[in-house]
UniProtKB/Swiss-Prot annotation:
One of its GO terms (cellular component) is ribosome. Keywords: Ribonucleoprotein, Ribosomal protein. Belongs to the eukaryotic ribosomal protein eS32 family. This is Small ribosomal subunit protein eS32. Initially thought to be part of the large ribosomal subunit. Crystal structures show eS32/eL41 to be a small ribosomal subunit forming a bridge at the interface of the 2 subunits. Component of the small ribosomal subunit.
Length: 25
């Protein structure tokens, strides 16, 4: 159960990080 929650949070964090990189370009 805990692993599932962490995976969901990581996926959202990864998506936000990708957007920041595109904006920097």
């Amino acid at each position: 159960m805990r692993a599932k929650w962490r995976k969901k949070r990581v996926r959202r964090l990864k998506r936000k990080r990708r957007k920041t990189r595109a904006r920097s370009k």
